[in-house]
């Protein structure tokens, strides 16, 4: 009887776990899909480090990518300094790829532009006339290794400065 229950549950769960194919507009970003674990990242403002992971999955029948993260922060001495959750939705809109980011600290960033090298990298940018300006870049360094960098131009300045960067490794 137990095996009938197990088989029934697996039959119900299997379609939900099946790989969703990205629609053509998002297909160049397929390299982002997966479960990623981070090495020690660098946090420029504090001189500390960060550690965490991301799950990036195809959603809405392949019409969107959803990134869900958790990040732990550490001070210069390596002691815990807090942490937060992050969510980002990546989607096509009128011929462009856009993204919406929110985190557990109350930040929201609207990425209105992207530069994509299919299967290799994507750089998201916030609106050019709104300050601060933000830029988020993912670059595939090798199969299963993804470099991430996040930078901003503060109000009254003209140059991007790093906020955080690190490397993610695909775990599944």
Regions found by a protein language model. Give the residues of each.
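Hydrophobic small-molecule pocket/channel-lining residues, especially in calycin-type beta-barrels
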Residues: 18-172
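Positively charged n-region of N-terminal signal peptides that target proteins for export
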Residues: 1-4
